[in-house]
UniProtKB/Swiss-Prot annotation:
Group of enzyme by EC: isomerase
Pathway in which this enzyme or protein is active: Carbohydrate biosynthesis; dTDP-L-rhamnose biosynthesis
Protein name (database record): dTDP-4-dehydrorhamnose 3,5-epimerase
Coiled coil: none
Keyword Lipid metabolism: no
Domain of life, per lineage: Bacteria
Active site: H70, Y140
Cellular component, GO, one term: cytosol
One GO process term, biological-process aspect: dTDP-rhamnose biosynthetic process
The family this protein is said to belong to: Belongs to the dTDP-4-dehydrorhamnose 3,5-epimerase family.
Key word Isomerase present: yes
Pfam families: dTDP_sugar_isom (PF00908)
């Protein structure tokens, strides 16, 4: 885990090293708490040296709502810094970089209003989430603006990927997310470049 006791934020690489879990510190007293949730210089030094150009937010009213798995093609490929500002969600990143040693593998983290954790999902990964509470709000910063022409997706429950989604009695998906291609049907979108 990166960071020192003097830092306001800690981070750790998940089992796919490019995906990072960030935990901002909370400073509390009788009034509540204060937390610095983003500092560009710290982020560029410790997580990814990229610019974040747009903030997005979505509300999912029902528990078991699935959004994803989404990504965008170059030149509008998006890295995403994701946080949950109300409720809780199961957040997932899937490596779609052809040639990567972790191609088709996934990592996840639970993000919630309570834990304040954030997930960095770099370009070259499909991103999605499932709400664990009703009226969950997700907020995320992205490295490129939305482009409908470059918008792509991946089947959320593809058995070849095998995401261990939380069990729900029902899942709420859009028609678009219900009809995304599986990994084996996905055209080459990103090539892995070893650094």
């Amino acid at each position: 885990m990166g960071g020192t006791e003097l830092d306001e934020m800690y981070f750790q690489s998940l089992s796919i090293a490019e995906v990072k879990l960030i935990r901002p510190r909370k400073f509390g007293d009788c009034r509540g708490y204060f937390s610095e949730v983003f500092r560009e210089k710290w982020f560029r030094k410790n997580v990814a040296d990229v610019g974040l150009v747009q903030d997005n937010e979505s509300l999912s009213a029902q528990i078991g709502t699935v959004r994803g798995l989404h990504f965008q093609l170059e030149p509008f490929a998006q890295g995403k810094l994701v946080r949950c500002t109300r409720g809780a969600l199961f957040d997932v990143a899937v490596d779609v970089r052809v040639g990567s040693p972790t191609y088709g593998k996934w990592v996840s983290a639970e993000l919630s209003q309570e834990n304040g954790a954030q997930l960095w999902v770099p370009a070259g990964f499909a991103h999605g989430f499932m709400t664990l509470k009703a009226d969950t709000v997700i907020s995320y910063k992205v490295t490129a603006p939305y482009s409908a022409e470059h918008d792509r997706g991946l089947k959320w429950d593809d058995p070849a990927i095998g995401i261990n989604w939380p069990k729900m009695t029902t899942y709420v998906l859009s028609e678009k997310d219900s009809s995304q291609p599986s990994l084996c049907e996905l055209p080459v979108s990103f090539q892995y470049v070893k650094v």
